[in-house]
A protein has these predicted regions:
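Short, conserved beta-strand element in jelly-roll/cupin
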Residues: 124, 129-134, 141-160, 197-198
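Contiguous mid-protein beta-loop-alpha structural module that forms a pocket-lining wall or clamp
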Residues: 4, 8-62
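Short amphipathic alpha-helical linker/capping segments at the junctions of internal repeats
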Residues: 1-3, 33, 45-50, 164-173, ...
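Conserved metal-binding segment of the jelly-roll/cupin
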Residues: 1-18, 25, 160, 167-187, ...
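A short, N-terminal "cap"/entry segment at the start of jelly-roll beta-barrel domains
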Residues: 44, 48-124, 128, 210, ...
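Active-site lining segments that contact anionic ligands and/or coordinate catalytic metals
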Residues: 107, 124-127, 145-146, 155, ...
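Short histidine-centered beta-strand/loop micro-motifs
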Residues: 15-16, 121-122, 137-143, 184-186
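A short hydrophobic beta-strand segment most commonly corresponding to one strand
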Residues: 4-5, 19-39, 149, 189-210, ...
């Protein structure tokens, strides 16, 4: 459930420690947008990258207690924090639940952010994690911006444009832009968590974000 960013034009490689277990992850790419803009840039590095910082430098330097290095400069347009650990994210959601009202559409919805700006982690893609309390029955709304979800914890279902999609941990589903949707947690005793990545940085940057709440049927869709 860790979230790792590999921003545009950054060298990156994936691997598993010797003797480690097989690793499967979900990739989120902005290639369709970048290709449409004819701005794609792709290159292959011969060999492996040379390590220039200590292990876990980024999450240790930029992901601790709201503190950032006072003697470092960062001039990149993306977050200097490359790894957002689930072991920190889930407790943060639980703490946020103690002091925030439950949103009727999204429960507790927290955006992954650039610690230097408070904005999105990258210029073309955003990400968020939301907690649906036990027994949560979300109301329906729709908005511009496309969202791809992965269930990080629990089980439930989402109704998208009148069709029900059940999900459990590791399942992936998407909500297209301007589609009615509502999330439901099937457990009456355990919370559920949904991760998403989205194109909100682009939508918001172009001034195209808008949303609407469903008012019929007490805010819930009729399942087709």
């Amino acid at each position: 459930n860790d979230f790792v960013i590999t921003p545009n034009s950054t060298w990156h490689e994936h691997g598993v420690e010797e003797g480690g277990k097989t690793c499967i992850w979900q990739d989120g790419l902005d290639i369709p947008l970048v290709n449409a803009l004819e701005a794609n840039d792709y290159a292959v590095l011969e060999g492996k990258q040379e390590l220039i910082a200590p292990l876990n430098y980024s999450p240790i330097a930029y992901g601790c207690a709201g503190l950032i290095p006072a003697d470092k400069t960062w001039d990149k347009p993306y977050s200097p924090l490359f790894k957002y650990s689930w072991k920190n994210v889930y407790p943060a959601l639980l703490e946020a639940q103690k002091v925030n009202e439950i949103n009727p559409f999204d429960g507790i919805f927290m955006q992954y952010s650039n610690p230097l700006t408070g904005g999105h982690v990258m210029q073309t893609m955003g990400a968020a994690m939301q907690l649906l309390p036990a027994g949560f029955k979300g109301k329906a709304h729709k908005h511009t911006g496309s969202f791809v979800y992965q269930c990080a914890k629990g089980r439930g279902y989402t109704i998208i444009n009148g069709k029900r999609f059940d999900w459990k941990e590791r399942d992936i589903f998407c909500v297209p832009s301007w589609a009615w949707h509502e999330h439901h947690n099937l457990s009456e005793t355990e919370d559920a968590c949904l991760f998403n990545f989205n194109d909100l940085p682009v939508i918001e940057g172009l001034g195209l974000y808008q949303g609407r709440e469903l008012t019929d049927n007490n805010g819930h869709q009729q399942i087709q």
